[in-house]
């Protein structure tokens, strides 16, 4: 389920192949949401900014040679090129302007090798979770890394968070969008959630 198995992690499917096969045998069906950006579906996260540079740095050779460690290597490359950009985010009838290094819109809970979108994020809650990284230096991001692993990054004043069923994002110039590791769209963009759109075999939530 991708280089870092983030969808499997969100669904509580074990990394061990035998245990994963047991999930299929158990046959528990679960309906999950699907996100979309300009009509392109995604399960985990669609984002603008840092993660696009990361996706470009994380080429096939890096994935094959280093696996999950390749994310850390690609992240270091992306951080050296990080620049802020201006964006306008609309949710319902509210629009706000931001100067940011990354905007991420999550449908699932995990992405990027175990980073948490938001502490309360779930793939079957009928909502999208957005965050915008509005810090001024990459060193501030380095200090926040532990918070991203736990989903508590929203407590930092440099992180703007929002929750909704749809977002529209415009930027001062067209920017690529990374959706589940693939560059599938560009701004301006509309992000939507499609509740219960897919049925999967997965452990029951209380069994995870």
Model-derived regions: residue spans:
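Residue-level signal for tight coil/turn positions that link beta-strands
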Residues: 38-39, 125, 195
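ATP/nucleoside-binding phosphotransfer catalytic cores, i.e., glycine-rich phosphate-binding loops
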Residues: 91-93, 97, 122, 132-208
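Glycine-rich phosphate/pyrophosphate-binding beta-alpha loops
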Residues: 47, 51, 104-119, 183
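Gly/Ser/Thr-rich active-site loops/lids in small-molecule metabolic enzymes
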Residues: 60-70, 113, 119-140
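Catalytic core of DAGKc-family lipid kinases
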Residues: 1-102
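A short catalytic or substrate-binding loop motif that flags glycine-/basic-rich loops and adjacent residues
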Residues: 79-81, 124, 161
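Exposed beta-strand and adjacent loop surfaces of beta-rich binding modules
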Residues: 84-86, 127, 174-176
């Amino acid at each position: 389920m991708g280089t870092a198995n983030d969808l499997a992690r969100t669904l509580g499917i074990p990394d061990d192949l035998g245990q994963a096969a047991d999930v299929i045998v158990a046959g528990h069906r679960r309906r999950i949401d699907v996100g979309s950006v300009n009509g392109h579906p995604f399960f985990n996260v669609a984002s603008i900014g840092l993660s696009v540079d990361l996706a470009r740095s994380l080429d096939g050779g890096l994935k094959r040679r280093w696996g999950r460690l390749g994310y850390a290597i690609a992240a270091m490359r992306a951080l050296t090129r990080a620049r802020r950009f201006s964006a306008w985010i609309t949710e319902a009838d509210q629009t706000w302007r931001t100067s940011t290094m990354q905007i991420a819109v999550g449908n699932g809970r995990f992405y990027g090798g175990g980073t948490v979108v938001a502490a309360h994020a779930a793939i079957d809650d009928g909502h999208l979770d957005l965050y915008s990284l509005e810090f001024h230096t990459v060193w501030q991001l380095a200090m926040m890394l532990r918070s991203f692993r736990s989903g508590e990054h929203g407590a930092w004043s440099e992180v703007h968070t929002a929750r909704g069923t749809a977002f529209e994002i415009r930027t001062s110039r067209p920017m690529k969008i990374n959706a589940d590791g693939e560059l599938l769209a560009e701004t301006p963009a509309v992000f939507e959630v499609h509740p219960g759109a897919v049925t999967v075999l997965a452990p029951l939530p209380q069994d995870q």
